[in-house]
Regions:
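Extended low-complexity, proline-rich intrinsically disordered regions
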Residues: 1-131
Length: 131
């Protein structure tokens, strides 16, 4: 797989940069929950639909990935994890094997921040800006 094909694959599947999110979307709502688990953390993503997302764990670089339909992706981290999903259709998210609630099925982006530093899970749902 050469990098150009990989880039095209992400564009085809709806890659969203932080700038695109800021310029093209507004926050519909934000919810914050207490983080009740302790480090180290394991996040498992499961979906019935092919889903693009980007993620950053602890102080590592931002990465992009695609979950093929019916598959799971798993990540471990100690302090923080940020995950941006293009959509949450048929998406389930688990932290240390406990499902994170509040991820209703939607075709709009969602940003999830899990922070051991703040002892919180923050969920932000976005909607397209009306110009």
């Amino acid at each position: 797989n050469n990098p150009e094909q990989q880039t095209d694959q992400f564009i085809e599947n709806g890659s969203i940069s932080k700038d695109m999110l800021t310029n093209n979307y507004d926050i519909l709502y934000e919810s914050t929950f207490a983080l009740e688990q302790v480090s180290p953390f394991t996040v498992r993503l499961a979906t019935a639909e092919r889903t693009w997302y980007s993620y950053q764990t602890d102080s590592l670089s931002l990465l992009e990935a695609i979950i093929p339909s019916g598959e799971n992706h798993r990540y471990t981290f100690n302090q923080t994890m940020n995950i941006l999903f293009r959509h949450t259709k048929s998406l389930n998210l688990y932290l240390n094997n406990f499902e994170i609630n509040g991820l209703e099925s939607s075709s709009t982006p969602i940003l999830i921040n899990i922070s051991a530093i703040d002892n919180s899970i923050r969920i932000q749902r976005f909607v397209p800006k009306f110009n």
